Amino acid sequence: MFVRVVDFVSRPGKTRSLNEIIQSRLFPIFRVQPGFVDEIVLESDVEPNRVVALSFWNTREQAERYNQETYPTVKEVLAASLEADPVVRTFNVVNSTTLT
């Protein structure tokens, strides 16, 4: 399994709006992507404008395909709520309670 970790900084006062957009407009896009497994969105308890999204994919190739073909549209949808460009990092899942 493969994970994309996307770190967002919302515009001041836009964190709730950002989370609502992710849930209402982006979750449906994620669900139809080949290899998509799950999306978890975290809101910082100490930095009010920070949101981190973890998307889980069956393979690195499927995540990369999403990154090339769909992610540019996702960034456009979120642009009005963001203070800066999101930072994307990728990881291999090496341990998980759901995989054992």
Q: Which residues does each PLM region occupy?
A:
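An amphipathic, aromatic/His-enriched active-site/gating alpha helix that lines ligand/cofactor pockets
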Residues: S24, I29-V37, F56-R89
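A short, mixed-charge helix-start or loop-turn motif at secondary-structure junctions
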Residues: F8-V9, F56
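Intrinsically disordered, low-complexity segments enriched in polar/charged residues with Gly/Pro
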Residues: K14-R16, F27-I29, V41-S44, R65
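Short, charged/polar surface micro-motifs in flexible loops or helix N-caps
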Residues: P12, E47-P48, N58-A63
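Glycine-rich beta-strand-turn "strand-cap" elements at beta-sheet edges
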Residues: F2, V9, I40-N49, P72-T100
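Short, surface-exposed ligand-recognition loops at beta-strand->loop->(often short) alpha-helix junctions
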Residues: V9-I22
